[in-house]
A protein has these predicted regions:
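Conserved acetyl-CoA-binding loop-helix of GNAT-fold acetyltransferases
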Residues: 91-104, 127-131
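Acetyl-CoA-dependent GNAT
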Residues: 10, 15, 19-88, 99-101, ...
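Active-site acidic-Proline motif in GNAT/NAT acetyltransferases
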Residues: 86-88, 92, 120-123
Length: 157
């Protein structure tokens, strides 16, 4: 895992974003299974990305102790590989904070653009990424393990 010791404080006292560690793997695996299972077997894939030295990953911590979400960025290609927030905390700014954190790290590493894939039928994710400045640049059929089409989105940073 590419280590970055940068932490960000959240808007609420006790909230912060920190680099993911091996101790976060059970949380990441469980959340991946919960939110990505409609697309395929991501509960093993996402933890693999977190341990990959070509990736940077982070976890949002609430009240100083409870993980609420995570994000993984591939440094090699500038792609957000995964971003997820526990369902009860979605639409509270956690996803946006995680995305901004990765944009900051990407800029520090000299990246000029971020890419991501999101399911064609996932209108909530498309709206979230659109609000963050991402634009659809294409699509990829059968992108997900269960065969769904993904929209490819990018953002200059």
């Amino acid at each position: 895992m590419a280590r970055d010791n940068t932490e960000w404080m959240g808007g609420t006292q006790g909230d912060f974003i920190r680099p993911a560690t091996d101790g976060d793997l059970n949380f990441v695996r469980g959340l991946s299974n919960q939110v990505f299972s409609v697309f395929g077997e991501y509960d093993e894939m996402v933890p693999h990305w977190i341990s990959n030295p070509e990736c940077v990953s982070a976890v949002y911590i609430k009240d100083g102790r409870r993980p609420q979400g995570f994000v993984v960025l591939s440094l090699a290609i500038g792609e957000i590989l995964a971003i997820a927030v526990i369902p009860g905390s979605q639409r509270s700014g956690i996803g946006a904070a995680l995305l901004h954190y990765m944009e900051f790290l990407a800029i520090q590493r000299g990246l000029k653009m971020l890419l991501l894939h999101t399911a064609q039928e996932n209108e909530a994710a498309q709206a979230f990424f659109g609000k963050a400045g991402f634009e659809v640049i294409g699509d990829q059929e059968n992108y997900y393990p269960k065969g769904q089409t993904a929209l490819v989105m990018s953002k200059a940073i």
